[in-house]
Amino acid sequence: ICACLVGSEMCIRDSFTTLEEIKEFEPELVINAATVKYTLDAFRKILPVLPKDCILSDIASVKTGLKKFYEESGFRYVSTHPMFGPTFASLSNLSSESAIIISESDHLGKVFFKDLYNSLNLNIFEYTFDEHDETVAYSLSIPFVSTFVFAAVMKHQEAPGTTFKKHMAIAKGLLSEDDYLLQEILFNPRTPSQVENIRTELKQLLEIITNKDAEGMKKYLTKIREKIK
C-alpha cells in the first residue's frame, strides 16, 4: 500500500502491477502488508524505486530482523502491530482491541498511525522493539500453546459442553492461521520461558488433582482468580 499527499489530502493506492508504477507514484509512505514470511523480501524488492524521503512501514506481528533492516536501509520507518485479526475480532467494533506502535519509529510515521488507529477506536500502546517481542511472547505464545495442547489431547464429543465448544472454536480459528506465522510467533526467543511457566503450573495442578488435595485446590483457585481480576 502506497500513500502520498496531494495538497492536504492523502492519496492512497493499493494495487500496483510493476515497480515502475510505484516509482512514478513517488509514495511518501509505503505500508508493507505482506505475510510475515515475505515482509523483508517485499521491502528489498521495492527499495530501489522509492524516493529517499519515503517512510517505510510494516504491520507485522513478528518483528524479527526488522529493526536491523530498518537501521541499515537508510529510510525513515514506522513499525506497528494491530493486536487483533479477522479470526476473532469484531471488525465493526474495535474499541476493546489494541495496537502497538514501535517507539523507535519516525515521528511523522507515528503521528499518521496514531491518527489512523484512533479513528478505529483502538487502544494504542507505544513499545520498543524489545518490549514488543516480550509482549508477543507473553500475550500470544501462552494462549497459542495452551490451545495446541487442548487440540492435541482432544477427542470427538457427541454432546460437548459449552466450555468445550468455546475452546473448540478458538482452536479451529487459531489453527486456520498461516503455519509460518504460528511458527515465527512461537520461535520468539522469549517464548520458551513462557512455555516453561505453563509446564510448572501443570505439574502443580496435577499433584493437587492426583492427591485429591481439597485445601490445595482451594488455594490454587484463589490464586488464579486473583490473576484474572
Q: Language-model features: where?
A:
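Single conserved hydrophobic/aromatic residue that forms the stacking wall/gate
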Residues: I1-I12
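A short helix->loop->beta-strand "cap" motif at the edges of active sites that frequently abuts
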Residues: L50-C54, F75
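Redox-cofactor binding/interface segments in oxidoreductases and associated redox assembly factors
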Residues: V30-N32, S57-D58, I101
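Rossmann-fold dinucleotide-binding core
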Residues: V62-L66, Y70-I124, D133
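An accessory alpha-helical subdomain
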Residues: E126-K229
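Conserved acidic residues
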Residues: D14, E28, C54
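Short acidic-hydrophobic, aromatic-tinged amphipathic segments that line or gate anion-handling sites
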Residues: S15-L19, F125-T128
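Rossmann-like NAD(P)-binding element
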Residues: E20-L47
